[in-house]
A protein has these predicted regions:
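Flexible "arm" and connector segments at domain edges
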Residues: 1-143
Length: 143
């Protein structure tokens, strides 16, 4: 594998997008919230939807440049949405918990179970990610 001089971490990516949001006077929250205005929710959703559609079109054409562009834009918009919800300090732990949960989908022999379309199915070892614990563990500890 070649050494890439530009290996960004998730938190660095989120911080770059925070800088963009602050420079363009777009919302960045420091406290977690599920409450966005209807306008902001729809904007975030529509931006993600648009990039997903651009990815599909590029993939269907086999255009790797446009695929990379769409994926980069998806990540950028996702980072902005993380900042909009004030989840920037929790999202890495959330991702790690989802990873642990997803790996629990392997069966008792360490083998994946697939649906006909290729989707990975849950085994009897599966456990649901405990996102609530991650989001509120500091608050609970302070009480």
């Amino acid at each position: 594998m070649s050494e890439n001089k530009s290996q960004l971490t998730l938190l660095q990516s989120i911080d770059y997008v925070r800088e963009f949001h602050e420079s363009f006077q777009l919302p960045v929250r420091n406290e977690m919230t599920a409450e966005l205005s209807e306008k902001e929710m729809l904007l975030r959703f529509n931006l993600m939807k648009e990039e997903n559609e651009e990815y599909l079109e590029a993939a269907q054409r086999g255009d790797i440049v446009e695929i990379a562009d769409a994926l980069g834009d998806m990540l950028y918009i996702l980072c902005g949405t993380i900042n909009a919800h004030g989840l920037q300090l929790k999202i890495a732990e959330v991702f790690e918990e989802i990873q642990r949960s997803n790996m629990s989908k392997l069966d008792e022999n360490g083998k994946p179970i697939f649906r006909e379309d290729g989707k990975v199915l849950k085994s009897n070892k599966y456990f649901k990610p405990d996102i609530k614990k991650i989001l509120f563990q500091q608050e609970d500890a302070a009480m």
